[in-house]
Amino acid sequence: AREQRQPEASPALASEPSDNVLPLSESAHTILIGHGRVGSRISQRLQAEQMPLVIIEALHSLVEDLRESGLSVVHGNAASSQTLAQANIASARCLIVAIANSLEAGQIISHARAANPSLQILARAQADSEVDYLKTCSADLVVMGEREIARIMLARLGLPAD
């Protein structure tokens, strides 16, 4: 039977960190939410392609490491519209939500869409119910790892995914 996960509750938003003073000046950039297993792979490729990138990350120790490596990073919870504004969401061209918490991802997507209606929004999901939820929050594309694995394996056998 297919597991049907429900979106997880989001922790209360912490107060905004004090190391974000002025909004970033980047424009036509990609904003990446989360620099974990998925986000770090995306970040590496965007850097290799020299695409303008701003990362929003909640873990302070990771923020410091990313900044030391020369990346543009906003420290905070991206579910806060203030944190998104700090990353200059209004001038971004794409938002990639690479975090696993689908409820928080939905909040991020809703705030981002309100701030920038033409933004391309890509999101990660871990279950069918999360795919549906994130699409209702106005994500343009929602990718579920298990579906993609199955699709690629079937394609390797010359079979369509459906």
Show where each model-derived region lies.
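Cytosolic regulatory regions of ion transport systems
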Residues: A1-D162
